[in-house]
């Protein structure tokens, strides 16, 4: 669970509030030595939506490890889009990029097959309901993701995606998530290119760039994150509709922030944070103090 005290100005208007932001229940275990399952339900999301019956349940899958090299997953899971901000659990993210904020659903029903080259290298093919679908189960996304490690200090979540929107048009995502570690310092660099199949400027005209830095000092984390997103105003079809329905043509967006995290009882139980961030769209300035805690209710071995 995470709760936060916010002090914020948006377009010059002051707002103060204390709110619960995340309350999740995790259930995980094994049906057999080769089949595991996981459920993560978020009580902080609308639990039932006529367009999305399992809206409150982010994760609900079974995973079959068929062999040392192959595994197969069925159920509801994250749409495999590369990038470390997108991949992080929402409870661990204090402020998001516009892409992550605007995408309709990051978790959908589908199936995937993974080939494990080694413990740190896997290639995953996934077909699932589209993250751009407003509850229409006949819209799909086709995803290929590499979870890898190029060097001992360089890990990756890279993906190529073909995603169908409400108008049944496809957009391509090419996303490179990179995680670097050096001693107690960690750096994430995410690069995403988006383009419609008939878009004139396929590269570098509709993008997201994100950088996050963490320096772990004892039970403390010193953190900073910034992002820059843009979509050229010319990225529209002849009828005026946008190729990208998540980041509108003509968008140029900057956000940045920094903060401290403190883990008083080790790094897996309680986390206290103080974070400031701002953005260029709503001229938001937000300072927050908060606490996150995890409790094991039942553990069986």
What does each model-identified segment do?
Residues 4-14, 32, 49-50, 61, ...:
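Outer-membrane beta-barrel pore domains
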Residues 1-6, 13-130, 138, 147-150, ...:
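Outer membrane beta-barrel
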Residues 122-170:
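Loop-centered beta-sheet repeat module
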């Amino acid at each position: 669970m995470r709760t936060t005290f916010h002090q914020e100005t948006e377009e010059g208007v002051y707002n103060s509030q204390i709110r619960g932001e995340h309350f999740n229940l995790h259930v995980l275990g094994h049906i057999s030595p080769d089949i595991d399952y996981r459920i993560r339900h978020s009580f902080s999301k609308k639990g039932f939506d006529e367009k999305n019956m399992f809206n409150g349940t982010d994760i609900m899958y079974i995973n079959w490890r068929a062999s040392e090299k192959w595994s197969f997953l069925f159920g509801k899971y994250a749409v495999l889009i590369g990038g470390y901000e997108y991949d992080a659990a929402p409870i661990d993210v204090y402020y998001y990029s516009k892409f992550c904020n605007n995408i309709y659903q990051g978790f959908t029903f589908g199936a995937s097959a993974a080939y494990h080259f080694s413990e740190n290298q896997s290639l995953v093919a996934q077909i699932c309901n589209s993250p751009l679908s407003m509850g229409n189960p006949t819209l799909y996304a086709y995803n290929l993701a590499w979870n890898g490690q190029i060097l001992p200090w360089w890990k990756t979540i890279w993906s190529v995606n073909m995603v169908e929107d409400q108008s049944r048009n496809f957009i391509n995502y090419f996303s490179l998530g990179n995680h670097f570690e050096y001693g107690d310092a960690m750096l994430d660099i995410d690069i995403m290119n988006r383009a419609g199949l008939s878009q004139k400027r396929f590269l570098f005209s509709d993008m997201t760039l994100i950088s996050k830095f963490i320096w772990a000092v004892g039970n403390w984390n010193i953190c900073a994150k910034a992002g820059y997103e843009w979509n050229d105003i010319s990225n529209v079809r002849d009828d005026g509709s946008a190729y990208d329905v998540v980041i509108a043509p003509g968008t140029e967006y900057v956000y940045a922030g920094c903060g401290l995290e403190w883990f008083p009882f080790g790094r897996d139980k309680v986390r206290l944070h103080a974070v400031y961030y701002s953005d260029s769209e709503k001229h938001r300035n937000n300072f927050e103090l908060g606490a996150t805690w995890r409790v094991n209710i039942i553990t069986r071995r």
